[in-house]
């Protein structure tokens, strides 16, 4: 008999999360798995009181993670179908799923139960044999707490992200010294992120950047990405981005 219960403490899933990332065939998108997943609802799968799996559902009703241990007695395909057909009163309505091609088991379950799909993002990973290039260097500076409001305004205007979310997100990056800015005459033209992982995928650095709309198409993004890649490499990390 399998029971589904809402998880109140994410620390209960520590071992299962480790197994989940170990099963991936490539590094997973840090923004999704360490940004959006922690703020979403987690549900545990229990057999005789033992936690044998879990899934994650965001506030819009989309699955973000799905995992069942190999030692579980439940049939993973039947369990997945039960959930996505909205037959779990605990989980509730499921509208769809976000899944990476680097998550083979979860991807297979999604493809077996989907009517359509579309690509949301492409993941890129630094080549181990990457060679030096002739990209023009760019001088970026670490963002400070005093610059937070201006950085939030810049990002909100450039990509339309909610200011409340950006304030918390950028504030955390500034505290971790993982956010840079490129300025000209006190105006921000671009931001760059080089995010480290506290657990799982710790050999990687997840890169991100935003360029002002008026500055796009001029090669600035290439220079920012090159700066971030060099910074990651200098710390012995392999760069990735989406």
Task: Give residue spans per PLM region.
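Short hydrophobic/aromatic beta-strand element in the GNAT-like acyltransferase core
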Residues: 40-44, 54, 121, 177-181, ...
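Conserved acetyl-CoA-binding loop-helix of GNAT-fold acetyltransferases
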Residues: 73-86, 211, 217-234
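Short amphipathic alpha-helix that is part of the acyltransferase structural core
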Residues: 1-28, 130-164
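Acyl-donor-binding surface of acyltransferase catalytic domains
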Residues: 58-62, 70-136
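Generic N-terminal amphipathic/basic segments
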Residues: 1-62
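A conserved beta-strand-loop-helix scaffold within acyl/acetyltransferase catalytic domains
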Residues: 31-32, 57-61, 168-179, 183-212
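Conserved hydrophobic beta-strand within the GNAT/NAT acetyltransferase core sheet
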Residues: 97-99, 207-209, 239-242
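Active-site rim helix/loop that mediates acceptor-substrate recognition in acyltransferases
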Residues: 21-42, 159-180, 184
